Amino acid sequence: MSLQRLTALRALMASQPTALAAYIVPTADAHNSEYIAPVDARREWVSGFTGSAGTAVVTASQALVWTDGRYYTQFEKEADLSLWTLMKQSLPDTPNMEKWLTSNLLEGAVVGVDPHTITREEWTPLQTALLKANMQLVPVPRNLVDEARRQLGDAPPARPCNPPAPLPVHYTGMKSGQKIAMLREKMAEKKASAFIVTALDEVAYTLNLRGSDIQYNPVFFSYLIIRPTSVVLFHGTGDVENSVSEHLQKEGLVGFEAKCYDEVVPYLHSMAQELSEKGDGRHSIWLSSDASEAVHRAASGADVVKKPLSLISEVSPVALMKLIKNERELEGFRQCHIRDGVAVVRFFKWLHDQINLGATITEIQAADKLVEFRKDEADFMGPSFETIPGAGANGAIIHYSPSRGGEQTVIHKDDMFLLDSGGQYRDGTTDITRTRHMGQPTAEQRDAFTRVLKGQMMVGSALFPKGVKGNVLDSFARHSLWEVGLDYAHGTGHGVGHFLNVHEGPSGMSWRPYPDDPGLKPGQILSNEPGFYKVGDFGIRHEDLVEIIAVTKDTDHPKASGLVGDFDGRGVVGFNTLTLVPNQRKCIDVSMLTDFELCYINAYHKRVLETLGPILQQRGLLEDLHWLQQECEPIFRK
């Protein structure tokens, strides 16, 4: 199948007005979304690799995919390795795409890409590298993978266009009219005549609307253009539900217009002509640097005016606004994590009971049962991503996704079971990983489990200067693993949206800096998730969501009392852990814990029990309560 698809794509490459020596197939859609709808799953269709990150390059004789360490094992399972080459982009010896193209193509080669699927910040350095090598990067407006699909009788599915739903201010904490007013103030500071919002979660956040066009992500396909006296939404056919119009009116949004989703490029051309004809040279268009090359070109009027408008291309102010949650959003996060904790605790109690009784439970059945428990909780809207239920060796596949077709993996009593899951609630988003052994862990498993836990506790208890970049904390999580020559091939933490995308930029914790990271500040939500993966045997990951808080000597934080300064006025910040599910006591090697770590884990388990216990008691879930009490008993040294 992959050979047939590659052959069709290569034929289209050769038939272009200028034959293409290489064609690039990114993962992202026209909005640079991490998670995409089936209509945009082009890299998956041509390569067979289903991971959520990676870029394919196809030439006349080679086919390659660059992806990171989360997906090495998955790629080797899914792709036809006789046709496709894995480029391990996290490794120092792997050339990046630009280096590979300039080293392997002939001088004068033409490289093509759909300009809707590549951002300006990706396009520019690639174009520069190719030009230096006397090669050319060209936009190919009709996506060649889509064309190949049609030729093979496998046309892409229709683009989803579900009506968005209002999210009331008692969840959001700020009306959309206020958000637009703040953005217009920032536009005035930049002397921008228009601001183009291209990221789907940014449109949803700005208008306080949520959608269902991409599975697990409450967003809807749209663009938003904010001008001094108007706000234009491009969505669907341009018809907006009455409930949405009434919502926006109540939220103080004036000058609102709705247009067809496909009209955004013609509108940008028209706007560029209008502003260019004024001829005063004072008009700039502001858009995020991760907006597509196609939108950048249209916004500048590059193809329709003699002198293109200047563009302000930098991190989106909406991204920076939604990064810092307001108090209503933060309280929503705290509350939904309590309800989510109840659901996850009930699930693990059920799973252990089933395994101890000798029942046959597959990974898929476990994932489905967890959703059932979450459905019992108020304001649950669905999972926040596809559950990762890795039993045994599958736990070592970092972003494992079991197939519902064919033979199912059964969870056995001698398995280490890694469960990474999350929920979308109207008041917040959760993401939690717990690793539990279904029977008795080996000494090696206990050692790895404890080292990963020590790393998570080192991050969770850290104090650091306000505004420090997330990469500074990454080595804290790896310290105990590094001491014995172990590591993990993913970042330590990502931002999380408020009833939005479970992965949210521009901040995070990784070994390399996030390019637009404004620094860690109170009000941000991050994950704290170190891990260890022994390929072919087991995987371990501990993941909590944490809220960044300001810390003084009087703050409820385990290290607050030891403060003697505030970083010369910068301010001290730390983390408050939101996730409330115990870690498995029998997997912890107590001899490896410091006194501080032992107190920390016991205090955490005490808080879990004191928070969730009364809820289970009130609901009459006494067996679940008894299980939680056992799991949260204090840990002592022998």
Put a short name on every predicted segment:
Residues 1-638:
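Active-site neighborhoods and metal-handling regions in enzymes and metal-associated proteins
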